[in-house]
């Protein structure tokens, strides 16, 4: 089976009705398998080469996939998707050219692309890569609406915490081994958390001064606004000073109004904050038209 894009996968799955589909992070699985199969060798005095045993890497990859496939009885025999990242990234093209610019270049394992070419010919997996999308986006599009791809339920399998932002699926978070059941509400919460917190490794800063305290804010949101007063005593008597004061939101004020207010305190406009949210967003089914290859940027 050749490498597919989302449109081809959609057409191939038309009429299917599987109980579930396993949507795996192909980038991560392949990199881990190949890295574990690398070794140094010296073929002549004082000259060393980095090598990769592709047969060993292939076995590690197959064992990893098998271990996840058999994690639960209900997953056995489910179709498997391996998602991969395109060389062009829509976030750089449409949102911010500095996206992931802070990341140090990581050298691919030896023979990486040849290994992928062989993997893409395997019949037992659906290998999918979509123009301009990261593998994460491919996974998000499929998992947020598995019925469009011939399955009643999707399970995301990855070590990346950002998949907490994908709704209507289960997420096997390989870092912890926990299986998270995700709803629209929980996924939206995590997306706003990432928007506020930011992710320096991905090149977006969020709202300055928050970090992990974004969790407390989202659970107990408030409005912060500038209040100007005149000093009535002391050496600066008569001078105006401005302080940012917290208050409870009014009934007509939304969570987004609260987020805008803490952004304003940090010197950000609403569009600045939206830009953070767009970079934090893993695409969902209704945010990408895989027929026309059109991306619908997130807005609150």
Swiss-Prot record:
Disulfide bonds: none annotated. It is an enzyme of class 3 (hydrolase). InterPro entries: 5-3_exonucl_a-hlix_arch_N, PIN-like_dom_sf. GO terms for molecular function: DNA binding; double-stranded DNA 5'-3' DNA exonuclease activity; RNA-DNA hybrid ribonuclease activity. The keyword Hydrolase applies. The keyword Nuclease applies. Its EC number is 3.1.11.3. Transmembrane segments: none annotated. Keywords: Bacterial host gene expression shutoff by virus, Degradation of host chromosome by virus, Exonuclease, Host gene expression shutoff by virus, Host-virus interaction, Hydrolase, Nuclease. GO terms for biological process: degradation of host chromosome by virus; symbiont-mediated suppression of host gene expression. It catalyses: Exonucleolytic cleavage in the 5'- to 3'-direction to yield nucleoside 5'-phosphates. It comes from the Viruses. Plays an essential role in phage DNA replication by participating in the removal of DNA-linked RNA primers. Participates also in T7 DNA packaging, host DNA degradation and phage genetic recombination. This is Exonuclease. It comes from Escherichia phage T7. The lineage of its organism: Viruses, Duplodnaviria, Heunggongvirae, Uroviricota, Caudoviricetes.
């Amino acid at each position: 089976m050749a490498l597919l894009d989302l449109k081809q996968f959609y057409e191939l799955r038309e009429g299917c009705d599987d109980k579930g589909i396993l949507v795996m992070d192909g980038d991560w699985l392949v990199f881990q398998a190949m890295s574990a199969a690398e070794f140094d060798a010296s073929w002549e005095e004082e000259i060393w080469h980095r090598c990769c045993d592709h047969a060993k890497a292939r076995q590690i990859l197959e064992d990893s996939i098998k271990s996840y496939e058999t994690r639960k009885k209900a997953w056995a025999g489910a179709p498997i998707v391996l998602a991969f990242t395109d060389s062009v990234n829509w976030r750089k093209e449409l949102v911010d050219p500095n996206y992931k610019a802070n990341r140090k270049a990581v050298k691919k394992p030896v023979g990486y692309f040849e290994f992928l070419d062989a993997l893409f010919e395997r019949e037992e997996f659906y290998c999918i890569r979509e123009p301009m999308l990261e593998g994460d986006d491919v996974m998000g599009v499929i998992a947020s609406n598995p019925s469009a791809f011939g399955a009643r339920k999707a399970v995301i399998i990855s070590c990346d915490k950002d998949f907490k932002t994908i709704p209507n699926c289960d997420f096997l978070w390989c870092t912890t081994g926990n299986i998270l059941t995700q709803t629209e509400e929980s996924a939206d919460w995590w997306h706003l958390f990432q928007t506020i917190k930011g992710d320096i490794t991905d090149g977006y800063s969020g709202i300055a001064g928050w970090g992990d305290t974004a969790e407390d804010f989202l659970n107990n949101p408030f409005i912060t606004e500038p209040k100007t007063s005149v000093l009535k005593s002391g050496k600066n008597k008569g001078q105006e000073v401005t302080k940012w004061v917290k208050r409870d939101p009014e009934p007509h004020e939304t969570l987004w109004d609260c987020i805008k207010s803490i952004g304003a305190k940090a010197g950000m406009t609403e569009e600045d904050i939206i830009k953070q949210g767009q970079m934090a967003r893993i695409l969902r089914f209704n945010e990408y038209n895989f027929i026309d290859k059109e991306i619908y940027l997130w807005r609150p």
